[in-house]
Each structure stands twice: as C-alpha cells, then as structure tokens.
From Swiss-Prot:
Compositional bias annotation for Low complexity: 149-165, 610-621
Name of this chain's protein: Serine/threonine-protein kinase sck2
Function: Protein kinase that is part of growth control pathway which is at least partially redundant with the cAMP pathway.
Active site: 392
UniProt catalytic activity: L-seryl-[protein] + ATP = O-phospho-L-seryl-[protein] + ADP + H(+); L-threonyl-[protein] + ATP = O-phospho-L-threonyl-[protein] + ADP + H(+)
Family: Belongs to the protein kinase superfamily. AGC Ser/Thr protein kinase family. PKC subfamily.
GO annotations of cellular component type: cytosol; nuclear envelope
Residues in AGC-kinase C-terminal domain copies: 528-605
Short name of any one Pfam family annotated for the protein: Pkinase
Organism: Schizosaccharomyces pombe (strain 972 / ATCC 24843) (Fission yeast)
Keyword entries, A-Z: ATP-binding, Kinase, Nucleotide-binding, Phosphoprotein, Serine/threonine-protein kinase, Transferase
Source lineage: Eukaryota, Fungi, Dikarya, Ascomycota, Taphrinomycotina
Single Gene Ontology BP annotation: negative regulation of conjugation with cellular fusion
Length: 646
C-alpha cells in the first residue's frame, strides 16, 4: 500500500470526494494493515450522505469497557532568558557547532576511554519549529581541546551582503590535555523572523539514538554581533558519568540580503509527494541553505475544480497559525505565486507521518498515545483560541519532527472565524473521524467536532483499529451515529477508557470540552502527571524518536516519489499547462497569497515592491488589507471558485 505520508503532506490527496459516490476508501479494518481514508467535502450540489434510514440520533449511548494500567511521562528542564534587542529582528542567524569538551576529576586515560565509547554523537538543533540535524561528531586528534571562554561579544561590521562575507571565525584551539574531544565542523543558517533561543540536543547514534543531554543558547539579535558560547550540557541520567560536559558554539546575526522570494530562490532536492493539484518537494533555500518542504499547486487545476476559495483559505489559516507561534503546528515560512502556480513553503518534518508509524506498530503503548494526544491538545488550543476549527484530525495529518514531537499540518478543510456560539454546516472531514452532528446535519456543528475526532484518534492509537469500523461507508455512518464502542479487555487504563467515552459523547453539548474547550479536556485524570508548561516548551522527552540520519533524510517517505527524477524549475505539470493563460479576473482570486514569516520586515527595512505583486511581502497591516480585497475578489469570481464555507 502506498505510504500516505508522501501523498498527504499539505493534504494533496484530500480534495472534493463526492459523498454520494460509490467510490472511495474503505474505513480502517481491525487488526489489519491500517487502511487510509480520503477526506470528504460537500459536493457541488451540497449533497450529504444518505442517512434518512438511520432514524433519530442516539445521544449519550453507553459504551462497554474493560480495564488496564496507566503510567507517567518523563521530562527535562531548561532556563530561557533572551538578551534585549534594539529592533524587531529579521535576517539570518548563522550558528557554528564547535566541539564537545569533557572535563571533571577523572584521569586523562579514563576520559579517553569514556570518549571512545561515544564515537557516534550527533546534534539536533531546534530553532523555533525549524530543526537541523548535524553530521556525526568527529573525534579531534588527541591532545587538543578548545578553550572555555564564555560569551564574547566581539563586533563584526554590519553589512547587507551574503553570509559568506562574514564567516564565523574558527574557535581558538589550544593544547590542554591528552583527551580526544569530538568535533563537528558543521554550521547552519536560520531564517529569523522573531527572537527565540536555540535548543541544542545531543544524541548517541551508537546507542539506539539515546538522548545524551541538552543545552540552550540565547544569541544576541543585534546585527553583525559575533558571539562565542561554551555551554554546560544538562546530561540525562543514563549519561551522568559524563562530568562537566560542555559544548562550544558560535553565532552571528546579519540583516536580510533580499526581501522577496520566488521559485528561483530554492533548489529542489527530492520529490516527496504528488496529488491532484500539484507536487511537494524537499527543497533547499539558496541564501541560507535551510531545508524546507515546498508545495507547488497548479492554478488552472484549482480553478477548474472550483477550489480557489479553499486553497487561498488554507494559506490564510496557515498565516494565522504561524502567528500563533505554536510549536505543534507546521509553520508557513513563505508563500508566493507565478502566473501558473502557487507555492507554499513550510518547515520540513523529517520524522515522518504518524500514520506511517502507526501502520508499522499497529497500535501504540498507552503512554506514547497519551504524549501525542497531549501535544495535539496544545495544537488545538492554539487553533480554537483564534476561532479556527480544524475538522480533519487524523494520523495522516500529524507529522513528527526529528525528536519525536508532533506537528499538525494540512488546513485545507479548516474553517476560520468561528466565534463562540456560532456553527457551520459544511459536510467535510474524513469518514472514520466524522462526528455524528456532521453526518446528521440537524443544527450545524462547532469546534466540538475536533474533540470527537480526538477521541477516535486516541482509540485507534491504543487499540489498533477504528472504533466504528465497517465494510462500507453507509454502515460506518450508522455505527458513528448509533454503534457501541467496545474496548479490548485489559488493554486500556480506566482513565483512558473514561476519556474516550467522554470525547465520544454523541451530544456535542455534553461532550468533554463543551464547557471549557481544551482546558477542560486537559484536566481529565488521564493527563495527571503531565506538566503542561514543560510540554508546551518541548521540555518533556518524547517516548519515541524517529530514525533520521540527517536534515535531508527522506527515508520516511514513499520511494515511489523519492526515487523519481525531479524537474529543476518546479513548474507544475498537468494537461492544462499548455492552454491559454488565466485571465486577470481569475488571477485576482489569488491576490494576497504572498507571505513571508516576518511580520515586521516591511516596516523594519522599508521594503515595498509595488511593481511586482507576485513577489511582494505581506506585513501584518498589508495582510489585513489584502484579506479585505481578496474577499471582494472572491465574491466577484464565485463562478470560478465555488462557494465559501458559510
């Protein structure tokens, strides 16, 4: 079966599956290779699934249950203090990873023996939601060690040229002992839109990627300032024999070298997905060499399928979620367009899709499922606070980063601007995860549909199959509206079963979360022992770490795509590509699509490119104006775009 990770990145496979069609994916079957479901949307005629033979809705249906055990999730600590800056930073931060220094009261011979056992260490650098995986650490020749000087604020002249014009000096090396120290000559450049600390995690590849230790650095965001750090590493209990472990790093921050981006600013590395509207590539940004995921969509296909409103709406929601700054939502970094195509550039999550890992494991231990559900709650919290209902929660839309934290993606079925007390009626979602109120369409629905899907997801992760499994879609709908949910004997804890029961309450007014949204769900005993502040700061170690060999590792993607030769110009390929160009009226439907993840870039640097609307940057002020203009254009061009979700 095709790996849905590759097809579902950005939701390429989800669009407009008619609800009254005989075709479509069957729901997941119990204890078998998990089948993936296509989301469904309202058809052109607004047709809903045939449920007239289902009878009245079943409210608060009792669920059968059995017992199991429960345990807790571990955590780690850190201190976050950022230096003050005299401006809103927008530019490039270059980080050079120096060497590890292992000190302490041991003899040189003992330390040398200790180091020889740790010859496959590597570093995962977390910069906001962007991550970098270093090459394996190399051992420096014996008798050499770096100095342990602390932060050095040596000035580097300010310049708007490329990063190479101000290379980071090599750390001073001096002979201090006969201890070999690991050395990595790697460096990374991050695109900066806001001041954040740098989270550095060290892992031992030679010991099944065991976590070794963690440290933070808090770089200055003053332009041209070079800094040198030699930070103490907080080691894990398994490596507490490593006394006084330190990591040397250097940073320098520089202003932007350009203020607009297009396809020519990125180099394609691999094709990682393909769908109805276009392709998804693993790309490298030329100026910073950062790796991202780029979705390329054909405008003509979008217009032909009347999906302009949904496509631009997805971009709008990605802008809002990027502003939310949630570490558990895939961040939009750039969006731009050409006369033919739309481009969405987000962080690349090399850990793979949760669906892919669930398919391999069949089910997860309860503690692992608890960790994912807890982080998903924080993602939903960020969405709901901004009036966004997600509507398509499922394993295919949950990505893992290199360290094993989740990141929610694909907002094509989400709806924004849903205030408290209001409802919507569009029939959309994925069959296995549809809430009863969506199927019955009696009085519309609200954000409670996300909690129903969360309950289905928790059941599926812990039991290995869908709670409402059926051989056909109509029977699946009946099971969702009426069916009993049965729990395998002895598999789940009392708390897990109770949480699933409360989330799968068929009356949305009595569903857990109805009276306090995410915060109400977080208080359930299932989550006792979780420090939510540490979880939000990613200070709790994930129970599972994906195998990732480097920042461009695509081993978690379908080889059907990654083994294909790629077109270097990113242009979408479809049967309409050689037809007449789109009219200016239709092109106006895509107005305001361009975005760069730096709300203050226009104001900070005075960049306004009025001659090139396809490459202009949308600041927060401009974004609001663009949104207003775009709404008018959408209303004028509904013949091309289809109806906007009410």
């Amino acid at each position: 079966m095709m790996n849905k990770w590759a097809k579902n990145w950005f939701g390429l496979s989800k669009k407009s599956v008619s609800t009254n069609s005989a075709k479509g994916s069957l729901p997941r079957s119990p204890l078998a290779s998990i089948q993936t479901n296509q989301p469904v949307e309202e058809g052109e005629g607004g047709s809903l699934p045939s449920v007239s033979n289902l009878g009245p809705s079943s409210i608060d249906h009792p669920m059968e249950e059995f017992a199991s055990d429960q345990s807790t999730v571990g955590n780690r600590n850190s201190n976050d203090i950022l230096p003050e800056v005299d401006h809103e930073p927008s530019g490039y931060l270059k980080l050079q990873i120096g060497s590890l220094v292992l000190g302490g009261p041991h003899t040189d011979a003992a330390l040398a023996m200790e180091c020889s056992r740790l010859n496959q260490l590597f570093v995962v650098v977390q910069f906001g939601t962007t991550e970098f995986v270093s090459p394996p650490l190399k051992w420096e020749s014996p008798g050499r060690d770096i100095g342990t000087s602390s932060r050095d604020s040596a000035n580097v002249s300010r310049s708007s040229s490329m990063m190479s014009s101000h290379p980071i000096p090599t750390p001073a090396i001096q002979r201090t002992s006969s201890i070999p120290n690991p050395l990595t000559p790697s460096y990374v450049v991050f695109d900066v839109a806001k001041p954040v600390p740098i989270d550095v995690n060290i892992y031992d590849h030679g010991n099944n990627n065991e976590f070794v230790g963690r440290t933070y650095i808090h770089p200055s965001y003053n332009y041209g300032q070079f800094e040198q750090f030699c930070n103490s590493v907080e080691v894990s209990p398994a490596y507490n024999r490593m006394v006084d472990l330190r990591l040397s790093l250097n940073t320098v921050f520089q202003p932007l070298s350009q203020h607009s981006y297009g396809p020519d600013d990125f180099v394609p590395l691999k094709l990682i997905g393909k769908g109805t509207f276009g392709q998804v590539y693993l790309v490298r940004k030329k100026d910073t060499e950062r790796v991202y995921a780029m979705k390329v969509l054909s405008k003509k296909v979008i217009v032909r399928r009347k999906e302009v409103a949904h496509t631009v709406g997805e971009r709008d929601i990605l802008v809002q979620t990027s502003a939310a700054d949630s570490p558990f939502i895939v961040a939009l970094r750039f969006s731009f367009q050409t006369p033919k195509d739309l481009y969405l550039v987000t962080d690349y999550m090399a850990g793979g899709e949760l669906f892919w890992h669930l398919q391999k494991s069949v089910r997860f231990p309860e503690e692992r499922a608890k960790f994912y559900i807890a982080e998903l709650l924080l993602a939903l919290q960020a969405l709901h606070k901004r009036g966004i209902v997600y509507r398509d929660l499922k394993p295919e839309n949950i990505l893992l980063d290199v360290q094993g934290h989740i990141a929610l993606c694909d907002f094509g079925l989400s709806k924004a601007n849903l205030s408290v007390g209001t409802t919507t009626r569009t029939f959309c979602g994925t069959t296995d995860y549809l809430a009863p109120e969506v199927i019955l369409d009696e009085a519309g629905y609200d954000m409670m549909v996300d909690f129903w899907s969360l309950g289905v997801l928790l059941y599926e992760m812990t039991c290995g199959w869908s709670p409402f499994y059926a051989d056909n879609t109509q029977q699946l709908y009946k099971n969702i509206v009426f069916g009993k949910v049965r729990f395998p004997r002895g598999l789940l804890s009392v708390e897990a079963r109770d949480l699933i029961k409360l989330l799968l309450n068929r009356n949305p007014k009595h569903r857990l979360g109805a009276h306090g949204d995410v915060e109400e769900v977080m208080k359930h005993p299932f989550f006792d022992g979780i420090d939510w502040k540490k979880l939000a700061a990613k200070e709790i170690s994930p129970p599972f770490k994906p195998i990732v060999e480097g920042e461009i590792d695509v081993s978690n993607f379908d080889v059907e795509f990654t083994n294909k030769a790629i077109d270097r110009d990113f242009s979408s390929t479809d049967e309409m590509s050689t037809s007449a160009p789109l009219s200016s009226t239709v092109q106006n439907g895509f107005k305001g699509f361009t975005y760069i993840d730096a709300s203050a870039m226009d104001e900070a640097f005075g960049y306004h490119n009025s001659n090139d609307s396809a490459s202009s940057i949308s600041s927060q002020d401009d974004y609001s104006k663009d949104n207003s203009d775009m709404d008018l254009n959408r209303a004028n061009d509904e013949v091309f775009m289809g109806q906007i979700d009410p």
